[in-house]
Curated annotation (Swiss-Prot):
Residues 254-287, 472-500 form a coiled coil. Residues 1-13, 339-363 have a biased composition (Polar residues). It comes from Dictyostelium discoideum (Social amoeba). Keywords: Coiled coil, Developmental protein, DNA-binding, Homeobox, Nucleus, Transcription, Transcription regulation. This is Homeobox protein 4.
Length: 740
């Protein structure tokens, strides 16, 4: 059975003025002080400790404007590094067509001789027009937040750890057109989330600007204005409320705290007559969690002609027990509203004449309760119309609710709230100058009278009797609130850390779009890079737990759009690779000449048979007859023969290798050139074998050859054959392909 002392403690719980209100979110930043690796991250970001860093060097090994490929060779062959901004502009200039697929159809079947002809096959560019979701407000209210996120990302990319000349642009810059009208309202330019120097910071939401503004208050001022959460959600997201896994979940504790704040403010303003129902509802919710208060619709006139209240619950089987002869009924909510001036009931008063107001709050059963009643319950046949209504609990257990209403409306003295130590089964006597019932007031029996002696000084002893219990309950409630706030802060910090990791990975993926076209100098340690990013985040935004819900949602949307741009850029590079590797090679009648370096142009030649034409053979034979003394063409001579014959350098080299082996000795005999054991004439060749033999050939003006040999003829023949193999320029795989 609930006693009056418990009721008084609940009332004094609500009467404490802002001293027991949501006792401080003091642990917003304390949870982040002991994070592992913070000292390491501070060292990594320190400019004096550059040796600990793992620098990222981004190379762009292909010129997107010319669409030339880069071989995966040494970094010395890489072209001059372009700014990232220029590279991205080049990427966007060669982006996707309207149908989201590359148009790789050739305009003609002519030979591809340079990159200008390859550009005829390029895909058509389209502008980047990303549209923000409908639930995101892109007015001037979010301009400061957009600039703040962009500034932090630019600072991170311009750090010494990255060798980037220009940062990766934010996709939201495209949507800031005509959004710079109200930047000076309430000095929001200086109130961005930039300065977080105290452990205790108020996250006050400005409804006029719909933006979080940090207020650098004193560390002792820890009142958290959390009463506008629902209003914030309705203002920012009028269409739908997104469920974000990276955002903190606001549980029912905030809603309960808001109710407590409202009650405290009403007590301070002495609006006791307007808050009777609120106090009643709070007490009823504490006793019966299945009941909650709601306002009936307009025009709903709820009468009590059947002498039953609108409290819907299961009728109790317990019977009313009374030890006194004078029978009294507990006052209903509607009766108390009509009798605001006098809060006690006459013994023979008939409740049949009472009617509730149309807009009076009623207590209905919870939707979770299967026994919900949409209409007031009808009295049982055995129940008298003059009998009090039946509650889910016995009348003795619920009579204290009426006392709470009486106590909350006595503004004369706060200490009188602790004097109601009896049930409403007895008479309520308001004796202003009664000194005879002091002994009865000192007892806590349920059968004594309630004597509200407002001007009686002897009642102060009784008033002080329950103060210790009240303070104990208040401290316990404060401890519970602190524990709930700490748990909420830990959840928010964990979600925000996941959001920071998502942002970091999005930036890295946006920089290194495709590993085939972008290279990293040395080996980048992503763990150390994340510590640097996290420390920069703390320096710029403050504690991880204080970024706010709207900022967290914006960062997540920022990462989503950045990832979309990364995927589109990756598709662009894949389209280029597929274009070169598949499309050009299947052109009928032409074959692609692969590029050996980044500066070489892409060429294609007509496909020909294995045997050379007669005209090409005559040109090559005439050249070797004229140079029979030294049949080794230089690179310039090979290019000249290439232009005359229309052959490739590989074909010319293979022809000279085969001719020197098979026809040069015969041509030398026909020309009257004397050779030693069919040794091929050369200008000067020094051969060293294992025996230490030296063979020196010198070409004189009279085409005579002077030979000095220290080895036998077999060694000379072996050395000469070895020399022939070294002169084929590494292209002897087709040596027998062009035999006559």
């Amino acid at each position: 059975m609930n006693t009056v002392e418990e009721n008084n403690t609940k009332i004094t719980d609500n009467n404490n003025n802002n001293n027991n209100n949501n006792n401080n979110n003091n642990n917003n930043n304390n949870n982040n002080k002991n994070n592992d690796g913070e000292n390491l991250s501070q060292q990594l970001i320190d400019s004096n400790n550059k040796k600990l860093r793992s620098p990222i060097q981004v190379y762009f090994d292909s010129d997107v404007s010319s669409c030339s490929l880069q071989s995966q060779s040494s970094p010395q062959q890489l072209p001059t590094q372009q700014p990232i901004q220029q590279q991205i502009n080049n990427i966007f200039n060669h982006f996707l067509p309207q149908n989201q697929a590359p148009l790789l159809q050739a305009q003609n079947q002519q030979p591809i001789n340079n990159i200008n002809q390859v550009s005829n096959f390029q895909i058509q560019p389209i502008p980047l027009t990303f549209q923000l979701p409908n639930n995101i407000n892109t007015n001037t209210n979010n301009t400061n937040m957009i600039n703040n996120v962009q500034q932090f990302q630019n600072n991170f990319l311009n750090n010494n750890d990255f060798s980037l000349t220009d940062p990766v642009p934010s996709p939201f810059v495209l949507f800031n057109n005509n959004n710079n009208n109200n930047n000076n309202n309430n000095n929001n330019n200086n109130n961005n989330i930039n300065n977080f120097h105290h452990n205790n910071i108020n996250n006050n939401f400005d409804n006029n600007n719909s933006n979080y503004n940090t207020i650098n208050t004193h560390p002792n001022n820890t009142n958290n204005n959390s009463s506008n959460i629902n209003q914030i959600q309705s203002n920012i997201y009028p269409q739908q409320n997104l469920h974000n896994p990276f955002l903190p979940i606001h549980n029912n504790n905030n809603i309960n705290n808001n109710n407590i704040n409202k009650n405290n403010n009403n007590y301070n303003n002495n609006n006791n007559n307007k808050n009777n129902n609120n106090n009643n509802n709070n007490n009823n919710n504490n006793n019966n969690p299945q009941l909650f208060s709601m306002e009936p619709p307009n025009g709903f006139n709820h009468s009590t002609t059947d002498n039953t209240s609108s409290v819907s619950s299961v009728p109790s089987n317990k019977k009313k027990s009374s030890k006194t002869k004078q029978k009294s009924k507990p006052l209903t909510i509607q009766q108390q509203q009509q009798h605001k001036s006098n809060y006690h009931q006459q013994p023979n008063q008939n409740s049949q004449h009472l009617q509730s107001k149309p807009n009076s709050p009623i207590l209905i059963s919870s939707p979770l309760n299967s026994q919900q009643n949409s209409s007031p319950p009808q009295p049982s046949p055995t129940q008298s119309f003059l009998s009090p209504p039946q509650y889910s609990q016995s009348p003795q257990n619920n009579n204290f609710n009426n006392n709470n209403n009486n106590i909350s409306n006595n503004n004369n003295n706060n200490n009188n709230n602790n004097n109601n130590n009896n049930n409403n089964n007895n008479n309520n006597n308001n004796n202003n100058n009664n000194n005879n019932n002091n002994n009865n007031n000192n007892n806590n029996n349920n059968n004594n009278n309630n004597n509200n002696n407002i001007n009686n000084s002897t009642n102060n002893n009784n008033n002080n009797s329950n103060t210790n219990n009240n303070t104990n309950t208040n401290t316990n409630n404060n401890n519970n609130k602190n524990n709930n706030n700490n748990n909420n802060n830990e959840i928010e910090n964990n979600n925000n850390e996941e959001l920071i990791l998502l942002w970091y990975n999005s930036i890295i993926k946006n920089i290194i779009v495709d590993e085939n076209h972008f290279k990293i100098e040395n080996q980048f340690n992503k763990e150390n890079g994340y510590l640097v990013f996290k420390q920069l985040f703390k320096n710029h935004f403050g504690s991880i737990g204080t970024i706010g819900k709207e900022m967290a949602e914006y960062i997540q949307l920022h990462c989503e759009v950045m990832n979309e741009i990364t995927e589109l850029s990756k598709f662009h590079f894949q389209s280029i690779d597929n274009f070169y590797n598949n499309y050009i090679r299947i052109i009928n009648g032409y074959s692609l000449i692969p590029a050996k370096d980044s500066g070489a142009t892409i060429k294609a030649r007509p496909k020909k048979g294995a045997k050379l034409s007669k005209e090409s053979k005559d040109i090559l034979e005439n050249w070797i007859k004229n140079h029979i003394a030294h049949p080794y063409p230089t690179n310039d001579e090979k290019e000249q023969l290439q232009r005359q014959t229309g052959l490739t350098p590989n074909q010319i080299s293979n022809w000279f290798i085969n001719t020197r082996r098979r026809k040069v000795p015969t041509l030398c005999d026909e020309a009257g050139i004397i050779t030693n054991s069919n040794v091929m004439p050369q200008m000067t060749i020094n051969n060293n074998n294992n025996n230490g033999g030296n063979s020196n050939f010198k070409n004189n003006n009279n085409n005579t050859i002077t030979t000095t040999s220290t080895s036998n003829n077999n060694n000379n023949n072996n050395n000469n054959n070895h020399n022939e193999m070294e002169c084929d320029d590494g292209e002897n795989e087709e040596s027998s392909e062009y035999d006559d």
